[in-house]
Swiss-Prot record:
PROSITE patterns, alphabetized: GIDA_1 (PS01280), GIDA_2 (PS01281)
One Gene Ontology cellular component: cytosol
HAMAP family xrefs: MnmG_GidA (MF_00129)
Reported function: NAD-binding protein involved in the addition of a carboxymethylaminomethyl (cmnm) group at the wobble position (U34) of certain tRNAs, forming tRNA-cmnm(5)s(2)U34.
Location in or out of the cell: Cytoplasm
UniProt main location, coarse: cytoplasm
Protein name, as recorded: tRNA uridine 5-carboxymethylaminomethyl modification enzyme MnmG
Cofactor names: FAD
Lineage: Bacteria, Bacillati, Bacillota, Bacilli, Lactobacillales
Keyword tRNA processing: yes
Gene: mnmG
Pfam families, per the entry: GIDA, GIDA_C_1st, SAM_GIDA_C
The family this protein is said to belong to: Belongs to the MnmG family.
Binding positions (FAD): 15-20, 127, 182, 373
UniProt record, GO biological process: tRNA methylation; tRNA wobble uridine modification
Amino acid sequence: MTHNFAENYDIIVVGAGHAGVEASLAASRMGCKTLLATINLEMLAFMPCNPSIGGSAKGIVVREIDALGGEMGKNIDKTYIQMKMLNTGKGPAVRALRAQADKALYAQTMKQTVEKQENLTLRQAMIDEILVEDGKVVGVRTATNQKFSAKSVVITTGTALRGEIILGDLKYSSGPNNSLASVTLADNLRDLGLEIGRFKTGTPPRVKASSINYEKTEIQPGDEQPNHFSFMSRDEDYITDQVPCWLTYTNTLSHDIINQNLHRAPMFSGIVKGVGPRYCPSIEDKIVRFADKERHQLFLEPEGRYTEEVYVQGLSTSLPEDVQVDLLRSIKGLENAEMMRTGYAIEYDIVLPHQLRATLETKVIAGLFTAGQTNGTSGYEEAAGQGLVAGINAALKVQGKPELILKRSDAYIGVMIDDLVTKGTLEPYRLLTSRAEYRLILRHDNADMRLTEIGYEIGLVDEERYAIFKKRQMQFENELERLDSIKLKPVSETNKRIQELGFKPLTDALTAKEFMRRPQITYAVATDFVGCADEPLDSKVIELLETEIKYEGYIKKALDQVAKMKRMEEKRIPPHIDWDDIDSIATEARQKFKKINPETLGQASRISGVNPADISILMVYLEGRQKGRKNIN
């Protein structure tokens, strides 16, 4: 079929949420002529739900995005109103940064970045059709019948695909925040042969700040100690006049109001058909599932420095408006609250992610990539991480270069993508530290050491940043070597100083590195005894040193496990293997293999329902095929 294309691009990204922004910036920065099409230019990088970035596991993802050369970390470091390190009382594997964002400023600043980016065209357009010829993407068609050619297309439509907002008994076609839904494109994806699922998510009401009695709530301030998402941000730029959040709770009256109106709740009346998020349930769902709990936490989160809107985190609901007002006013501090926006639920179509490769390219159509909530995930950070990987791989495909696959041992982004393409998801997928078996080596403090080299090799990390990274890496390695070479002896003067600090005296000579393995001994304490490095160390290097030294034994065990799994990951499975040709594997395993088509032995081993015996048989089969080829040659 001959198309009359209005314009030609290397890559077209459909949707300008958090996934679309990262995908388009990555592709254009890698030298590809890129079009970013969105239904509404005013909603670029918009936050339709919580006004925050980061949190448990998610904060590590933002650091990973930054280390690879993505934008989210830099953007939130310019636009936050509060910064807080979570889980500081726990081990380093689960620590993560979280920022309250100035919602409007975040979107505005990201839009400016996109508008200034070379090779990137931003256009308001509804994409209705992905144009495909001979199983390959060739372009897109808009609702106004304009056609644009592309060698790769990335779909990042968020919750807009056949979106429907639900509020009480009201249900109507809409994307998030009453934007347009993308219905024709949803039909087109089905017609192209993609399996489609249906998910649901929700958002809480927003209340007017001046109507809140904060004296009845508990203040939740940010951190005084500087912290940043981007490895390029400087401590001297840390914002000190931060805006606090506030803590309050539901109570028995709140629960009574909900219970008395469950018949009007779409969650229970049968109006909601989509599957909702397990880890972010609606308040009505929480009251029913945890009926024994007398109260639930609610955080009052300002949506910006210059707005009255306050997000009531923990009160996601699709109850009717009148019930929402009564519910809000039953809560301590909100007795006179003015509701500025109602909470609502939204149902939307997703592309079932078992149809994707680890590059986020669909197996059905060459050159078609999907990312973000389109793939069944929840959260801005999960979306941005996928968008970055999809954009990178779309560009690499266009350029004829080797693809980028992040392994589970490389990044939380790799864990997420592997979970999606290997196991699929039956509900909106959220990243958790418990999903990562190698979480001790996937920490927030070492994201640059893990990923910046990759970002540099693919062209997303520039020379200036790479030089800063290499200097930090050299500082770390040199200081580690120095600490391992200096001996502390159990002489009386040394032990006296150690005891004065409240620590146990030495009984044997040990290196400064061994001394730092003691739980109470920080780098600052150790250098009191052995002196400092020749040049002052970056605070990020000091944090990395302390973690790597104190957890060295555990880290080594994790790296040994990674090495074993690497051997499995290196055993590739041919793309067009006939699974019926393999004798003796269990029926369930055969069915799963046919559905998912794993690309490596390692991926095959992680499919639920596949047991070690099936993997052993598959390994023997693959080795037999390889020997057969050698004999033929």
